[in-house]
């Protein structure tokens, strides 16, 4: 009898505790997204119906206030819906939100210690060291390598069109982007268009092929529940992809140092940072090989590999998506396609270049309309559909009576905000001219596809150049066949990116 009563009492107390936990925001008077216990707002993600980015966009669309209280599993979090507040959090109030709150374990898992994950002083010191790597002078120095991959892209498409006039443009752009990363970041001589079975491509392809449950749990817990990711690593979980790329990078670094091999790429700059503690100015000497005794090196191979893997994950997906979606949208808007193609032709003529010539950094910088096309693409299809921060000290929300407590995860739905008609007229259309300097008919606070403030994307300049080269090379050498207008739908993916449900197919013809 007493056992039954005790069980009922414990069950009642547990129910009351759980109910109280999942109505926390409601009791504070904060607009709240109802929780599906025990998943919170993650039920569609856990059922693999929606990606995390699209699930957050769904919540964004269902509410109207500045902030929405949500539950990521059992973690009390805040979704920011107000563009001005979101920008303020990442810029002027950065001191209260200087970390992302994702998994990192510098001591036991140095491969997790990348610029995206790091916290506090560790992040600040590394950011200062890496920032010179992405100056316009450094990118100009690496441009020849980027352009070489662009030429291989054109050659591949010319061969593919001999078989069919239809191509899966996202797949093609992914190969292009991965080869740039392999060449510029990892210092490899590769051509995945001709040799898709090369070691780097095989390793990188396994990131999308690996459907193991452990990988999905680890990937999602890095964002949603870092202690689970930390526990998995302490128990021996290790990313085969990361360790394979680390070993590949180690061999390349050792070969370069042993044989005094110098190449104008990001790896050369990372080697210099490892050996000297700094990267240096935009001059020819920055590419020189400088070595140091192992005990004097400022960064381990693991930490170098962690940064390279971050650049791979962020750079390959964002470049592939931006270039593929730009071409896809232009194919549906013939007047914009004509304008873009005519600009490419005019700029090539201005710089005395033919479509098959090596492009120059200066010519690509002159493609101003293509700039705003890519700006509109990454508004509509942000490479990372949400931004995340962690509240690092209690923060009074401006214009409200609410206080965000220290330790609370903060989420900003870029997909939701950048498709909100409050901020962008006709948000589901494709209108590059909204970014014309004499137009600007949108709320500039709401546009932040690369993040904002001190933790904005460090490689945004290189990402834009990579995408522009791909699109410009294709427009210079091929005509896009007009496609019927159709909205893209997205499917579940454990990684925090946009993955289309259906292939992005385009029809091309060779230009006469």
UniProtKB/Swiss-Prot annotation:
State what protein this is by name. Probable cytochrome P450 6d2
An example GO BP is:
response to camptothecin
**One Pfam family, short name:** p450
Could you tell me the superkingdom of the organism this chain comes from? Answer: Eukaryota
Q: Which organism is it from?
A: Drosophila melanogaster
Location(s), subcellular: Endoplasmic reticulum membrane; Microsome membrane
Give the bilayer topology: Peripheral membrane protein
Q: Which GO terms describe its molecular function?
A: heme binding; iron ion binding; monooxygenase activity; oxidoreductase activity, acting on paired donors, with incorporation or reduction of molecular oxygen
Q: What does this protein do?
A: May be involved in the metabolism of insect hormones and in the breakdown of synthetic insecticides.
What span is annotated as the signal peptide, if there is one? none
Assigned GO CC terms: endoplasmic reticulum membrane
- EC number, as in UniProt: 1.14.-.-
Family the entry assigns:
Belongs to the cytochrome P450 family.
What keywords are annotated for this sequence in UniProt?
A: Endoplasmic reticulum, Heme, Iron, Membrane, Metal-binding, Microsome, Monooxygenase, Oxidoreductase
Per the record, the coiled-coil ranges are none
Cofactor dependence is on: heme
**Which principal EC class is assigned to this enzyme?**
oxidoreductase
Residues reported to bind heme: 457
């Amino acid at each position: 009898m007493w056992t039954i009563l005790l069980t009922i009492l414990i069950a009642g107390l547990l129910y009351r505790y759980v109910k109280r936990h999942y109505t926390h925001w409601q009791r504070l008077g904060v607009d709240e997204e109802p929780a599906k216990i025990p998943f919170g707002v993650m039920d569609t993600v856990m059922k693999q119906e929606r990606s995390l980015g699209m699930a957050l966009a769904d919540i964004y669309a269902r509410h109207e206030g500045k902030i929405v209280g949500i539950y990521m599993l059992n973690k009390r979090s805040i979704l920011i819906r107000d563009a001005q507040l979101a920008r303020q959090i990442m810029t002027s109030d950065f001191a209260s939100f200087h970390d992302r709150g994702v998994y990192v374990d510098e001591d036991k898992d140095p491969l997790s210690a990348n610029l995206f994950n790091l916290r506090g002083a560790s992040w600040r010191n590394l950011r200062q060291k890496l920032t010179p790597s992405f100056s316009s002078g450094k990118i100009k120095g690496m441009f020849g390598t980027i352009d070489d991959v662009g030429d291989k892209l054109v050659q591949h498409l010319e061969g593919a069109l001999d078989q069919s006039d239809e191509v899966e443009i996202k797949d093609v752009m992914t190969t292009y982007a991965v080869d740039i990363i392999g060449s510029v970041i990892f210092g490899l001589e590769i051509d995945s268009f001709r040799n898709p079975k090369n070691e780097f491509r095989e390793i990188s392809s396994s990131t999308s092929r690996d459907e193991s449950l452990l990988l999905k749990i680890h990937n999602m817990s890095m964002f949603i529940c870092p202690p689970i990711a930390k526990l998995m690593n302490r128990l021996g979980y290790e990313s085969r992809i990361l360790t394979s790329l680390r070993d590949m990078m180690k061999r390349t670094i050792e070969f370069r140092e042993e044989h005094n091999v110098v190449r104008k790429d990001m790896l050369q700059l990372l080697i210099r940072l490892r050996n000297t503690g700094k990267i240096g100015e935009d001059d020819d000497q920055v590419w020189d090989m400088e070595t140091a005794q192992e005990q004097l090196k400022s960064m381990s191979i693991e930490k170098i590999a962690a940064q390279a893997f971050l650049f791979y994950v962020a750079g390959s997906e964002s470049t592939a998506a931006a270039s593929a979606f730009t071409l896809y949208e232009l194919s549906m808007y013939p007047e914009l396609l004509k304008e873009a193609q005519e600009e490419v032709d005019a700029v090539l003529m201005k710089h005395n270049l033919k479509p098959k010539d090596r492009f120059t950094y200066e010519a690509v910088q002159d493609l101003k309309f293509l700039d705003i096309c890519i700006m509109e693409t990454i508004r509509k299809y942000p490479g990372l559909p949400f931004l995340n921060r962690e509240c690092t000290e209690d923060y009074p929300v401006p214009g409200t009576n609410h206080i965000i407590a220290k330790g609370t995860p903060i989420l900003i739905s870029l997909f939701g905000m950048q498709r909100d008609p409050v901020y962008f007229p006709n948000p589901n259309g494709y209108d590059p001219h909204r970014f014309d300097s004499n137009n600007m008919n949108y709320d500039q606070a709401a546009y932040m596809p690369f993040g904002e403030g001190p933790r904005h994307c460090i490689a945004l300049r290189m990402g834009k150049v990579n995408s522009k080269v791909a699109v410009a090379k294709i427009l210079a050498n091929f005509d896009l066949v007009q496609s019927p207008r159709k909205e893209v739908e997205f499917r579940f993916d454990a990684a925090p990116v946009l993955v289309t449900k259906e292939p992005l197919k385009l029809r091309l013809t060779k230009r006469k």
